[in-house]
Amino acid sequence: DLVAIGADLRPGTVLEAYRHGLFPMGVGDLGGPPVGWWRPEERGVLLPGALRMTRSLRRSCRRLRVSVDLAFDDVVAACADPDRPGAWITDDVRLSYGALHLLGWAHSVEAWRDDRLVGGLYGVSVGGLFAGESMFHRERDASKVTLLALVDLLNDRYADRRLLDVQ
């Protein structure tokens, strides 16, 4: 649900919003200005360790290489493709999350076939929460492989105190 309109997308503003359960998304055409601050009444939340893997997805995991924070800008650019249905990632959003990445708050998980980026996701990590913002795939299951890799990363000794918000 939309709870506010306005403000900037500076890292401090965005982080404070996440700490209060909000995320930014423009309310204009294709996510354009003004920026809206959203807090869905119901959220899609995954608990690390609660994901099931099909046989076909297991095969996909074996054929793709996964990395973390290696191609953040490329992942965001692929997610921002204006030809994708529901496109909402503007240049301002890309710059904001790029700054959050440089500060260590935003992260990406990438899937590769050889040297070609075929899938990925990005989001923001605050406390025990990873808020997944967007994902893309250029090959079947590539974005699912990155989601599984993220869950594996979050599934450590603190897993019982972590949430993955998939909005």
Describe these PLM feature segments.
Residues 1-167:
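N-acyltransferase acceptor-side catalytic subdomain
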